[in-house]
């Protein structure tokens, strides 16, 4: 798997909110991890690759338990969207500390002092200027996951690939490798195969959108050293999902 095969022009990195936390130190955001991500992305940008990010909010808010506590689903989802804005601002600060230029665009209408309202043309121009664009607020509508937001924004900005880091899992398997030691890992798999086998790498809406817009998906273990940088260059154990 050579250098040029994985030298994408524009990528979208999907980061989970939970992945930003440090549970051992009881930190919602591990700033050492943010610093590490920033250093990797600095090297990616030096290669001429344009970087956008969609970040989740699971380190601040888990909507799954909201309904049983009397919070309706749509309101719980909006709380989650606000959590992604907090993460986006934290990432921006960490990136700027490493000398990167970063913008936070929100799908929700917020005060411009907090985050810019998303306009596709502006975001695209930022990417062309080697600025990192962070998309926060999910899709701006309830009942959609941040995976769907990732494929939506990847489609809108014309990303070549979505780079999706998983915690402790280095690709797509036929079954949960943490529960089934005989699970088979795929080096390459098609979106149709993912759908037919009902593999839970993203929700169905996200998978269908990525397939329709011919966006490749790279799944890798984000806990490995320099994993983001190496995944983009094909230098790490991963799975590539294609049409």
Swiss-Prot record:
ATP binds at residues 14-17, 58, 62, 167, 173, 176. Pathway: Pyrimidine metabolism; CTP biosynthesis via de novo pathway; UDP from UMP (UMPK route): step 1/1. UMP binds at residues 57, 77, 139-146. It catalyses: UMP + ATP = UDP + ADP. GO terms for biological process: 'de novo' CTP biosynthetic process; UDP biosynthetic process. SUPFAM superfamilies: Carbamate kinase-like. Its EC number is 2.7.4.22. It is an enzyme of class 2 (transferase). Keywords: ATP-binding, Cytoplasm, Kinase, Nucleotide-binding, Pyrimidine biosynthesis, Transferase. Pfam families: AA_kinase. It is found in: Cytoplasm. Inhibited by UTP. The keyword Cytoplasm applies. GO terms for molecular function: ATP binding; UMP kinase activity. GO terms for cellular component: cytoplasm. Belongs to the UMP kinase family. Catalyzes the reversible phosphorylation of UMP to UDP. Homohexamer. This is Uridylate kinase. It comes from Mycoplasmopsis pulmonis (strain UAB CTIP). The gene is pyrH.
